[in-house]
């Protein structure tokens, strides 16, 4: 990976995030679309772009726990549940956790939970560290279509000027597993 090209694309993506725009970036298994989770405008743009219902809720991805802690109602998590999450993080595991009562419905959808993941992927770590907070993360595709696996796929599907962080997807062959930490149910396992 060209360090200069990566840094140039990182700066461009961070600027877009601050401007409440949507970006694409490589994740563990595919390219993702992301935006600032604190911006209703940005999240609604992302949902419109994907043609995704607000009722479904979204995933937040972070480089460390402090970036997602404010979204979680920790009083509803046991020590064992936290231990389970930290055992699997950083990595390709997303957990549905009780949402803090202040988390907006544009993130939780129709649920009282929020989906969170701490990633081990270089690109996500860099993005979240430089941006200083978690990102909304969803697959780079129109709902019910195949996800983008390369930068070229993203540019083909979303336009040649779409901001894409330079890099490659990780070695996972499927999207992250989603586990409801409260009841232990596996929501998504492909």
Curated annotation (Swiss-Prot):
Domain of life: Bacteria
GO molecular function: ATP binding; double-stranded RNA binding; L-threonylcarbamoyladenylate synthase; tRNA binding
Domain YrdC-like: 7-190
Record's keyword terms, sorted: ATP-binding, Cytoplasm, Nucleotide-binding, Nucleotidyltransferase, Transferase, tRNA processing
Entry's localization field: Cytoplasm
Entry's EC annotation: 2.7.7.87
Keyword Ribonucleoprotein among UniProt keywords: no
Pfam families listed in its UniProt record: Sua5_yciO_yrdC
InterPro entries according to UniProt: DHBP_synth_RibB-like_a/b_dom, Sua5-like_dom, TC-AMP_synthase, TC-AMP_synthase_SUA5
GO biological process, one term: regulation of translational fidelity
GO CC entries: cytoplasm
Catalytic activity: L-threonine + hydrogencarbonate + ATP = L-threonylcarbamoyladenylate + diphosphate + H2O
Family listed: Belongs to the SUA5 family. TsaC subfamily.
Function: Required for the formation of a threonylcarbamoyl group on adenosine at position 37 (t(6)A37) in tRNAs that read codons beginning with adenine. Catalyzes the conversion of L-threonine, HCO(3)(-)/CO(2) and ATP to give threonylcarbamoyl-AMP (TC-AMP) as the acyladenylate intermediate, with the release of diphosphate.
Protein name per the record: Threonylcarbamoyl-AMP synthase
